[in-house]
Amino acid sequence: KTYVTDFANPLVAGAKNTLVTPHLGASTGESEDNCARMAVKELRDYLENGNIHHSVNYPTCDMGRCMVEGRVAINHRNVVNMISQFATVLGDAGMNISDMTNKSKGDYAYTLIDLEAPADERIIRKLESIEGVLKVRVVK
């Protein structure tokens, strides 16, 4: 008898009567199609709504479908005082935050902010100028 596994570890790698194979996610045509559909759905959700799912470097962050004209997505370092700086820039510009979420993963964080009105280029530039901000994107 032989033990077959696709999850190698030091214990089974050198064991007698053991066959260790690479783990092949999406190893059938059907699973490849399902993975492709999932990737397209998640990319579309990111582009249209700013939501992130299954990212390697960023946390899952989902505020649902964007129902406002002023959603802003901010990729930034996961450091103290970022949220208050975003709120200060927006408040100083007279922008009201109607909804917001912030999620972090390791060294990076992601903030989605729904505004009652779209942010103009001047506000976006001020957000981009905050130390630790990597990217600001107007979703809608």
Positions of PLM-derived features:
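Rossmann-like dinucleotide-binding domain for NAD(H)/NADP(H)
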Residues: 1-63, 110, 114, 140
